[in-house]
Amino acid sequence: VNLFKSASEIAKKTTFVVRGIRSYTKSMSIFVKATSAKEPRTREARNIAYMYAAILIVFVLTQLFNFDEFLALLESFWLPGGVPVAYLLGSIIVVSEVLALPFLLRMKVSPLMRIVSMILGWLVSLIWLKLALWLTLTVNAVSNMGFLGTTIRLTPGWWTVLFSVALGILAAWASWGLWPIRRRK
């Protein structure tokens, strides 16, 4: 009995052929096979994606510059759930901003990673919108919104809500222009 089989031997035995299509192999390629991003629908959509990526890069660099102070800032927002939620949210924000970049910059990644990256781009704008609404509608005496961490103070107000909506529009426009799911013909 040969205990060490090659990957091609294993693939031959685990590939299901349905209507002439290699189902298992085709469906599993979404996880591991890096592919190039398809061309954007318009030049403007590509430029919007680059602009949103530049904004996220500035955000994440300034937030990571003083990450411990960024977490303390989120803690001062008095979010429901207290300190653990603030720390978790801070980590989710930074990780989402970083992982949204492969989709926006059209990097060569697997199709699944491209979809996850696109969704994280939406999540970033949604989190910032919720935080902006929370700080604007509650009576928290906070002097910094946190877009740029604690490096540059940006006072919360309705402008932060509008800016967060603008981030959502950029994410939606980039998603429309760089839509990663190909149609079957």
What kind of feature is each model-predicted range?
Residues 1-65, 69, 91, 95, ...:
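Extended, low-polarity transmembrane helix blocks
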Residues 65-84:
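Membrane-interface interhelical connector segments
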Residues 75-76, 85, 116, 144:
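Residue-level detector of alpha-helical recognition elements and their boundaries
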Residues 80-96:
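Interfacial helix-start motif at the membrane-water boundary
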